[in-house]
Amino acid sequence: MLTFLIPTAKEMMIPKESHPHLLPQDSQAILKIMAAMTTEDLAKSYRIKEEAAKKEQQRWQDMASQQSLAYPAYQLFNGLMYRHIKRDKLTTQEQAYLTQQVYITSSFYGIIPANHPIAEHRHDFHTRIKIEGQSLKSYWRPCYNQFAKEHPQVISLLSSEFDDVFSKDCKQLWISPKFMAEKEGQFKTHSTISKKARGAFLTACMENNCQTVDSLKSLVFAGFYYHPDLSTDHEFVYIKKEA
């Protein structure tokens, strides 16, 4: 069985379905630090303006006082990649695929199933805090490595931010898809292409119930197709021709 890892997103949209917010034990230490930060501290940590930091501070305070509601993560996150993932009107098989084979890597919650209930928050591995004297990446590394040992065949749709959270020896069987546009024989890639394509790729995997590495090579989605000459055992390249 294939396991997919996807990143979080800064952009969020409140879905209809909500739950009580139950915070994992490993996240409690992070919440304690974030909830104690002033607006000025948060602005520096996030590198945002103080006005925006006020909103984030309120979210942390609400979580600390157990006032937050939680929402299925894949529905709450609404960044460009998430908007290109099929999230509504799923078949029973697609719903099972999404909730059992897709996991989200978070610097606040750890690695969680795609439908895990989470609260509104802003947090990533660039957030400048120390937990028990450790960086966020060091703090989460044992948890992330344990997940990798339990799920050796991972399809990673993660950005470079996560490269050194996992130890290298945990990623020997990992495959990272790469998405490129071809125009007049020239290949290019950029953030927008990649984010849209990640969502479309995951949707195609769900719809086709891909369970083997070889099945990924026959996928055609949003104009992309597998390019064997540019691909390696650990990097599958998908090309889309532009007019």
From Swiss-Prot:
It comes from the Bacteria. GO terms for biological process: response to hydroperoxide. InterPro entries: YaaA. GO terms for cellular component: cytosol. This is UPF0246 protein Spy49_1742. It comes from Streptococcus pyogenes serotype M49 (strain NZ131). Belongs to the UPF0246 family. HAMAP family: UPF0246.
